[in-house]
Structure formats: structure tokens, C-alpha cells
Amino acid sequence: MEQKVILFQGDSITDADRNRTNDLSMGCGYPTLVTGHLGAAFPYQYKFYNRGIGGHRVVDLYARIKADMINLKPDYMSILIGINDVWHEIGGHNGVDAEKFEMVYGWMIEELLRELPDLKLMLLEPFVLPGSATRSNDENPGRWEYFRSETDLRRTVVKRLAEKYDLVFVPLQERFSAANADAPEDGYWLSDGVHPTAAGHELIKQAWLEGFSKL
């Protein structure tokens, strides 16, 4: 039986501390949860790759398009990118503004679809919550508003690109916001407002599988 290839692509949320020297390593996040679910439900039908790399912005992801995407010849692929394009600006003035984010993301999608015309691609929405990495503080009283508003811009871009290229869009912000509405303190779903806990990765897995069912 020829296995279909599923590729998870993104930043640290996808990377989730995977062993980058071991192709079988899915990390400690939603790719492992999805792999376990699909692997048990459909034995031997899929081969899985996780190529998320912590800290990456959309420009870093695009730079890896050949080695970590096209050369793997995926049948199905998900992309979750965007939070570092925001975070790197507030942390080191090295972010990617929303206009350039959309331009580069669009180039990447077009190249993927051109080189892999049968690829089934879904775009996951970036998300953020108040947390230790995102809340305002004395040094940066506008920190949370910046994170929220800039992430919102990139969420809008990802949805617009999914519509433009007729791709599956996987919403995540509302799922996290709703889950967090009654949280007694920060950190239950996203440990620092950006990185998911085990429970947060389960939310992504659920949304991922819903999106996958539409491919």
C-alpha cells in the first residue's frame, strides 16, 4: 500500500521540541496528537513529517520551501505561521509587517501549488492570549494591545489567502478565546500567551482534524 504523506509545517507551536535528527519525531504537540489519532484510525495509510522550526517567521518558512516542503512530496499539508512575525518586532525589531506577511505567504502558496498541483493544503489561523509573554508591563504598557491587534491583522490575512486560493481555513483564535473565557488565571491553554500547553495542543488537534475532514 502506498502511504499518503501528511506534512505539518510552522514555527515552535508545530515544532514542539521535536528531535530534528529523527524523521519519526513529531514533538510534544498537536502533530503527535494528530499522528496518533489518524495512525490508529487508519493503520498504515499515512506517513507523517513534522518540519516546524521554533522562532520562524513566514520569511524563514518560505526559505525552506524546497528542502522542507516540495522535496517531501506531501499529499496533505498544514501551515501554522504568524505569531513570530509579530513577536520578533516587539522583541527585537525584526518582525514581518502584515503587508509583507501577506505577500510572502502568497508567494509560498503559489509555488507550492505550482510544484505540487495535487497538494491538499490547509492554513491554520495564528492566535494569542494574555500571558507572561504578551501582557503589558511597566516597560511596555502597550504590549498586549500590540500583540492582539497585530495578530488580528495576520489572522485576517491567513483567512483571505485561504479564500483567494480556495484552501481550507482552520480558525483557532475563537476556539482559544472561548476556552479561556472562564480561566481563573493565565497559562492553562497557552503557557505564556503564545505556546500551547497539552490542553491547548488538544484544541489545535481537534480543529486540525475538522479541517482535514474538508480536504
What are these regions (language model features)?
Residues 1-54, 64-73:
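Serine-esterase "nucleophile elbow" of acetyl-processing enzymes
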